[in-house]
UniProtKB/Swiss-Prot annotation:
Record bears the keyword Nucleotide-binding: yes
Pathway: Purine metabolism; GMP biosynthesis; GMP from XMP (L-Gln route): step 1/1
MF term (GO), any: ATP binding
Occurrences of domain Glutamine amidotransferase type-1 (ranges): 8-198
Database matches in CDD domains: GATase1_GMP_Synthase, GMP_synthase_C
Record-annotated GMPS ATP-PPase domain positions: 199-391
A Pfam short name: GATase
GO cellular component: cytosol
Name used for this protein in its record: GMP synthase [glutamine-hydrolyzing]
Keyword annotations from UniProtKB, A to Z: ATP-binding, Glutamine amidotransferase, GMP biosynthesis, Ligase, Nucleotide-binding, Purine biosynthesis
Subunit structure: Homodimer.
Chain's gene name: guaA
């Protein structure tokens, strides 16, 4: 079997918002890589046996900070690529000079490649459109480095060591705004580091199945199946590896999208023949949420009750030794809790660090090394439906945070119908995959309406659709008025409890994507 970790690249993180993008681009060219804090122990770096090292960008100023690349990075004899801050500290640590730029540079820029033979710019044209994001610049390269690219505002836009395979770029090749960024990453990983492109879905599936079998043996495994992307792919890979040793518990909270519970059972229990226990807990959730209007309180109640019900069902399964979870690599990175990290943790993750202290089951995380886009590709490779894998994100508490205030059965049913119409029309008009997330929100206020000759006094549905790359910021989707008119007419005519439909035109910031 191919060892997919045999050729790998180590990424040292200086706190850049783009560090995970670097890792994703390296993996896209077929090379495994991992991210670690810049101040990780020297012995770890040495024992990692990387074929190459990438130094990320960062928010600090090189000449104001004592944050530097570990000297061992430059002593191992492996290629090094410094990006933005990574380039600046590498040059400075080799006798160069960095100063604050007269003018910060954020956005697209044109760089001119001065030397491209057998370096990171191989096979690229002289003029390249790139993405800059820096306030400092290299003013003197020192005796060891030479300039291999320049731009109007950054005369030292890229450097190469005169005798060692060390390279630096002031711009960000990992972003999609740098038109040939992937080629630059590929040149470094494959041509300079001499990595073989072993990291692909076929090899990952083969490797994961072998590792799961080795880890689990003949033990039984329990998985909480939600119908979301991560747990669905975990179910598929575990079933492929250990068959009927897997038991999935699907807690139907009643707060899912219209008919979603039936769809989950159809895909996994009927189509894939996976052992799934469906727990109809709709009434328990409604009872627990009665009279509760505070969003945070609703989240806590839903989360705790979900765990309680899961535990009740798990206790009934004899000889279970493992609990499988859909933890993915971005969860691991963002929940690492590294005190030296300059990157801000945007949110806590339900998949990491939330396990009961008294849990006696061992933890199995087959997706722990994968980013979300890799998880989706893995799911396709395992035969899961495209529409299941590429659905818009859905919050853990479900419709519980899309119904403002108290949750009632009538409100849930109303929102499910309205939301389903919105989604159906997005698919019908080929708009669904052009936007990042779209859903309905139930507003517990009534509005006067007229249908035919009848006066109606019913509820309001807000439609929300956004476009985003990373969901940390988002713009509202500029959907055609004709389309919105069709959706609005259908909802008001087909959902009797709704008399008015509004469209949310708030970006993030200042708003959040979800209303609660």
């Amino acid at each position: 079997m191919t060892d997919i970790h045999n050729h790998k690249i180590l990424i040292l993180d200086f706190g850049s918002q783009y560090t995970q993008l670097i890792a994703r681009r390296v993996r896209e060219v077929g090379v495994f890589c991992e991210i670690f804090p810049h101040d990780i122990a020297d012995d770890f770096i040495k024992d990692y046996h990387a074929k190459g090292i990438i130094l990320s960008g960062g928010p600090e100023s090189v000449y104001d900070s004592d944050v530097k690349a570990p000297e061992i990075v430059f002593e191992l004899g492996v290629p090094v690529l410094g990006i933005c801050y990574g380039m600046q500290t590498m040059v400075m640590q080799h006798g160069g000079e960095v100063k604050g730029a007269d003018q910060s540079e954020f956005g697209k820029a044109i760089v001119n490649i001065l030397k491209s033979s057998e370096n990171i710019f191989s096979n690229l044209k002289t003029e390249q459109s790139v993405w800059m994001s820096h306030s400092d610049k290299v003013t003197q390269t020192g005796e060891h480095f030479e300039v291999i690219a320049s731009s109007t505002n950054a005369p030292v836009a890229a450097v190469a060591h005169k005798s060692k395979p060390f390279y630096g770029v002031q711009f960000h090749p990992e972003t999609t705004h740098t038109e040939n960024g992937k080629q630059i990453i590929e040149n470094f990983a494959l041509n300079i580091c001499k990595c073989d492109a072993l990291w692909n879905i076929e090899n990952i599936i083969e490797n994961d199945i072998k590792e799961i079998k080795k880890q689990v043996g003949s033990d039984r495994v329990i998985l909480g199946l939600s119908g979301g992307v991560d747990s669905s792919v975990v179910a598929a890979i575990l079933h492929e590896a250990i068959g009927d040793q897997l038991t999935c518990i699907f807690v139907d909270t009643g707060l899912l999208r219209l008919n979603e519970g039936d769809q989950v059972m159809e895909v996994f229990a009927e189509h894939m023949d996976i052992n799934v226990i469906r727990v109809n807990a709709k009434n328990r959730f409604l009872d627990a949420l009665k009279g509760i209007g505070d969003p945070e309180e609703k989240r806590k109640i839903i989360g705790k009750l979900f765990v309680d019900i899961f535990d009740e069902e798990a206790a009934k399964i004899e000889n279970a030794k493992w609990l499988a979870q859909g933890t993915i690599y971005s969860d691991v990175i963002e929940s690492a809790g590294n005190s030296q990290s300059k990157a801000h943790v945007i949110k806590s993750h339900h998949n990491v660090g939330g396990l009961p202290k008294e849990m006696k089951l061992k933890l199995l995380e087959p997706l722990r090394e994968l980013f979300k886009d890799e998880v989706r590709k893995l799911g396709l490779g395992l035969g899961l439906p495209y529409n299941m894998l590429y659905r818009h994100p859905f919050p853990g508490p479900g419709l519980g945070v899309r119904i403002l205030g108290e949750i009632k059965k009538e409100y849930v049913e109303t929102l499910q119908k309205a939301d389903a119409i919105f989604t159906e029309e997005l698919y019908k008009h080929n708009l669904y995959h052009d936007i990042s997330q779209a859903f309905g929100v139930f507003l517990p206020v009534k509005s006067v309406g007229v249908v035919g000759d009848q006066r109606r006094y019913e509820y309001v549905i807000a439609l929300r659709a956004v476009v985003s790359i990373d969901f940390m910021t988002a713009t509202w989707a500029n959907l055609p008025y004709d389309f919105l008119s069709i959706v609005s007419n259908r909802i008001v005519n087909e959902v009797k409890q709704v008399s008015r439909v509004v469209y949310d035109v708030t970006g993030k910031p200042p708003g959040t994507i979800e209303w609660e």
